[in-house]
């Protein structure tokens, strides 16, 4: 997937995954009651930040599915798709399947 957003330093661009639309028992969850997704696919990664004159690479790669901080990042919309620009520090874990 080609994204027209190029993150700087240790920032990443994530496409949030869809929130669950139904409960485990099959009840439909209305939009007003759905929580913000905290899981998404990494679609772009910055080159990393400088620390003591050396570039520190980002720990995630394009295609990784990550869990991120609930209130981290900045929402942006481009090409009709919503993305989240996060600092690598806002990523809590990589989902391994």
UniProtKB/Swiss-Prot annotation:
Entry-linked Pfam families: Cpn10
Keywords of the record: Chaperone, Cytoplasm
One GO CC term on file: cytoplasm
Top-rank lineage group of the source organism: Bacteria
GO biological process: chaperone cofactor-dependent protein refolding
Gene Ontology terms for molecular function: ATP binding; metal ion binding; protein folding chaperone; protein-folding chaperone binding; unfolded protein binding
Intracellular or extracellular location(s): Cytoplasm
Similarity field: Belongs to the GroES chaperonin family.
NCBIfam families in alphabetical order: PRK00364.1-6, PRK00364.2-2, PRK00364.2-4, PRK00364.2-5
Function as written in the Swiss-Prot or TrEMBL entry: Together with the chaperonin GroEL, plays an essential role in assisting protein folding. The GroEL-GroES system forms a nano-cage that allows encapsulation of the non-native substrate proteins and provides a physical environment optimized to promote and accelerate protein folding. GroES binds to the apical surface of the GroEL ring, thereby capping the opening of the GroEL channel.
Assembly, per entry: Heptamer of 7 subunits arranged in a ring. Interacts with the chaperonin GroEL.
Annotated protein name in UniProt: Co-chaperonin GroES
